[in-house]
């Protein structure tokens, strides 16, 4: 076999050649480290987030066409790119050349916050426009289906995309985002006239036109190469792996004979993740992506034959074309396949993955294999011995040797037969999220009847996700043949299939009862579908479907989205150049979109740089018997391995580690994921390989405490207990009409910031100085803990933060620990050290939002007034205290939300468990505490027979009132938000419409709920609220401003420049902000608590006013001068042009002994109304509409403020509905990445989203009367939770099920389905508790 070793491809129009290619190298690190194209980001490494999206272009010499498709660079081996052209975000535009319209519009439509996901979003949209310059809304939504954003809530990204939509015959690109295709989705009036957007967030007239003629051309050299008929097999190799890329079938077969165990790889979407995450290594890879015979598309008399190398995206296009051309009776299978292909993975994976690879991988949760198996599909195989054909049946799917591919065989193509008349095929799936999520259970079902007789002649049913392989219910189907298609058959079928497709209680993946229920629920849906079709074909002989059942056949998937925004106009009295109150674009928006914004890991490699990674504990509670690092140290490139013995203890006054005074554990571990060793090597690859070779011997210890209930049982708490009491609770209980007791459990939440924990530590070489470049929220803490570990004073450690790719509270405490260890390694070896956590490590190590258990006892009157409330709050703190006590305290101080409970008592405990310590996360205890209170109110309403909204209103604060901690409060704006939300959401009208819908539909239900919000702003002490700033004026009249706040996406730097512009009456273009550093602003407080702009803005304002006061004589002498004139004059008179600004903090205190104080400066008020629709058979839900009204004071920047509100709302919606952490009974976290842990995607947002601000209100103590909005909106996500609750209540009420209805959070599809009890949930078998070990435990 001839071989060549040179790899040739193009990147952004430039030729790239590599003579010694390592087949293990993926495109992402090659772009970032070798080509220094850092715009393409690492987000997860598994193709699940889209941050690394690039466009790949290939020329097909047969069709003479160029195919452009999006791909995940993290899964693309560079060896697979021979002859391809890669386009990255840098290749389509930059600030140095010209920006592309896609980049411009995403930035100017305010579609970026932290900006880390933005290059991937840009490239997904760009690729779509290369193929479809005037896309439809459906195409846009599909194109972004593989991209995640944790900040924006997607609305502004969608609005940016809509500006490219077709406009002929449609108003899709109107400025308010409202399209004629989308209006009136629920048949109800929208906003009244006069409620339009008060000013535009962006002006489409400014946008650059999209001109396809200006795009990069496909390199002619690659076209010439592809046309050559004398191509050779190419072999690329390294010490560990060989990559073989044959050109002909003959060469492919030769390679397969020589290396029969080598996998055949097309897109690397299956083999790649297995190698990365499961440690499966293949010394030889065969990649036949240039063989024409594997890409055939043949139409025969019997069906369609598709080549094994055809991508899933191409299969989707082919099937869509076929279904348009052929009669429906022939395309039943193709329609079913298309249904799954709409939601299978994201566009990037669908364009990379091949049909053959998907089939042969035989993943147990494959969406296509169950369908192909029931459709009598066959596989065409080839080997040296010749061709043969095998059925794609259960034996093949189970890898039975007699029905499987032989090691030397390859799959050439797949035959998918046409369907026949009286034959019907359907596809079903239910996942945690509608799109880009593996199915919990999926199914393919096919039935064939005798002509017009309704008697089953053939029946085939297959399920995925319910066993180690796809399972066919062949025995059940055989017993049903010959039976008429009626309800008796259905009942028998359910019982037969439940018996045959059995799941043990300990089945991997858990959710056993839910999966059993889906097995029969899907079967019932199939029965309904076929029954309706039969009725349509023969009105006489088949009974009509009950009208209440018809909606069960409709999909819940959201396809189009629209929104309206109503916010404040800038003050008419202010100067026209004054930017305060205007929707100024994010300072880094364009750089986010071009990939030029520099994050920590984008910094160039420093000379002699090392890489550090961690070895973590695999046990929840154990003694460390021994640590053997010898094998790891012997590997090439390994420099050192640190253990706890090398690092000195740190001063425990840092508080966050409590009694663990070691950064690396030496004697005992208290959770899975605890840091044990740090491996330092010359490269990341070498460090990670070495980490896998460290051997740790453990001796397990008891008890292992994972849950709150176990902590309560073992009295495992951190001290002290906190208590808040108001009024006389015990006496009040004697005076009420009714008393109820209940509890609610709320699961935790992963931060899922897009940029993982990142740091680069550089020793300066003298005086033991060291620079720490880090993605962090609390530079001072990093400075202090690093100085403590290095035993130097703080003035030798400088911490620098340019920007952070998302944080949400997760880059405060744990970042300090990671940075201190990295700094110790850098100091020890006198070399720079970089540490970038992989996504799985990050989630495992850093903890997240605290799971909560809330217990309540409420005493109330029959009219809904709650007179007494006694509550207990428990949070799962994890192994170390971290910020858990503060979270409990904030939860207690905020628990009453918008309500006045005249007699209230609440106690709170932080539970010590054997989990990684949980920490701050947006909302800081309020999302949990508030949900407990709202659950109590909902149950009180049910007991009183009243609507929950009425009970909420009855118990709401009156205008002038007092909180439980005796702080005076004026809630006028709370009442106004509630009333306006009621009005703008048409609540009364829609409530009636929801009730009408529910009365007419049995298997689908709608729910409507409205919740108020009172979110206190303040940090509990004056010291925690101090801030400083430094402003320099240069002689050319330009200004440099620095302050202590961290830019995490919330736009604080943008607001600070607006402040300087107003105070100095200077254009924004003259002001610059470089970043945050302990070198310029010492002793900073952490950025969080919604006060970053408040506090630092007041410090910046103070600095500017100091300068103005100092320069007043100069300016008065030359009032018409410029800043350049004034600066030069001041310099000539030896007047300082630099000033520090300082804000000492809001007056804030709380005395826990008395339960009294003034912990908060002000309150943010709001209300949200959400409507949902649920599928009672599957547990799926659709977010139909949300209306939010917020009191924002006076908005400094409406674009940034509305972005914070809607981003927080979507994150909260995820918290309360789909984001679920799964732990093993041994304390191992399963959900360590986007493939297991689902945050909201574009498919999850409300189809309609309406946000409005109250008119401006005055507050002389805050920055221009503004309010901090970073956290408050997250709680409003629970309006979706209670809307689902309302829908479930309606379903249960119709079924005659008794109350009370108590639902835990998150309200996942599993919880929704199992709460909608019916005949199917009753027929499933249930395992006795204690008779099995569950796959996961609820934490």
From Swiss-Prot:
Q: In the UniProt record, which is one GO cellular component term? A: cytosol
Enzyme class, first EC level, given as a word: oxidoreductase
State which tissues express it: Expressed at high levels in liver, lung and spleen. Also expressed in kindey, eye, testis, duodenum, esophagus and thymus (at protein level).
Per its UniProt record, the required cofactor names are:
[2Fe-2S] cluster; FAD; Mo-molybdopterin
GO MF annotations, alphabetized: 2 iron, 2 sulfur cluster binding; aldehyde oxidase activity; FAD binding; flavin adenine dinucleotide binding; iron ion binding; molybdopterin cofactor binding; NAD binding; protein homodimerization activity
For this UniProt record, give its keywords in alphabetical order, as a comma-separated list.
2Fe-2S, Cytoplasm, FAD, Flavoprotein, Iron, Iron-sulfur, Lipid metabolism, Metal-binding, Molybdenum, Oxidoreductase, Phosphoprotein
- Which residues of this UniProt protein bind [2Fe-2S] cluster 2? 114, 117, 149, 151
Q: What is the predominant subcellular site recorded for this chain?
A: cytoplasm
- Phosphoserine PTM positions read 1069
Cellular location of this protein? Cytoplasm
Identify the domain of life. Eukaryota
E.C. no: 1.2.3.1, 1.17.3.-
Cite the cofactor comment.
Binds 2 [2Fe-2S] clusters per subunit. Binds 1 FAD per subunit.
Protein name, entry field: Aldehyde oxidase 1
Which source organism? Bos taurus (Bovine)
